[in-house]
Amino acid sequence: MAFKYWFVFAAVLYARQWLSTKCEVPQMTSSSAPDLEEEDDYTAYAPLTCYFTNSTLGLLAPPNCSVLCNSTTTWFNETSPNNASCLLTVDFLTQDAILQENQPYNCSVGHCDNGTCAGPPRHAQCW
């Protein structure tokens, strides 16, 4: 009878050892652990602001057809495509109005052609 208990005891120990090797969770080492300190780079999705002149004909690019833009991390110039509307000239009689925010002034509108604002001019109100 003692032999039966010894046999059952040995079988239980063997089963326990077998289960502990098959079911153990592998421990992470420093080389296999994910780097929780690293942050994702979301700058590509950051809000982008570009600065145009507003007019009765729509938004106008600057005379050099290179629009100043910025995101939360960087400033850059974005070249306007050919035939985009651009600010050709400003009426010098209303130049003082430009210094006052949201005051309309007379301006001439052209179109971008290889990085420069070209005519024929169209007249508009700008602000």
UniProtKB/Swiss-Prot annotation:
Task: From the UniProt annotation, give the residues forming the signal peptide.
Answer: 1-23
UniProt main location, coarse: secreted
Localization (cell): Secreted
Using the UniProt annotation, give the residues that carry a glycan (glycosylation sites).
54, 64, 70, 77, 83, 106, 114
Altering residue 74 to A: what's the impact? Slightly reduced binding to CCL5
UniProt cross-references to Pfam families, sorted A to Z: EVA_Class_A (PF19429)
Supply the name of the protein.
Evasin-4
A GO CC annotation recorded here is: extracellular region
Question: Which Gene3D superfamilies does UniProt cross-reference here?
Answer: 2.30.130.100
| Family to which this protein belongs | Belongs to the evasin C8 family.
What job does the chain carry out? Salivary chemokine-binding protein which has chemokine-neutralizing activity and binds to host chemokines CCL1, CCL3, CCL5, CCL7, CCL8, CCL11, CCL14, CCL15, CCL16, CCL17, CCL18, CCL19, CCL21, CCL22, CCL23, CCL24, CCL25 and CCL26 with nanomolar affinity. Binds to CCL3 and CCL5 with 1:1 stoichiometry. Although binding to CCL25 is observed, does not inhibit CCL25-induced chemotaxis. Has been shown to reduce cardiac injury and inflammation in mice through its anti-CCL5 activity.
GO MF terms here are: C-C chemokine binding
Which superkingdom does the taxonomy of this entry point to? Eukaryota
Q: List the disulfide bonds.
A: 50-69, 65-112, 86-117, 107-126
Q: Which GO terms describe its biological process?
A: negative regulation of chemokine activity
In its UniProt entry, the species of origin is given as: Rhipicephalus sanguineus
Record comment regarding domains: N-terminus residues are involved in complex formation with CCL5. A N-terminal derivative peptide composed of residues 37-54 inhibits CCL5 activity in monocyte migration assays, suggesting that Evasin-4 derivatives could be used as a starting point for the development of anti-inflammatory drugs.
Subunit info here reads: Monomer.
Keyword annotations from UniProtKB, A to Z: Disulfide bond, Glycoprotein, Secreted, Signal
What happens upon changing residue 52 to A? No effect on binding to CCL5
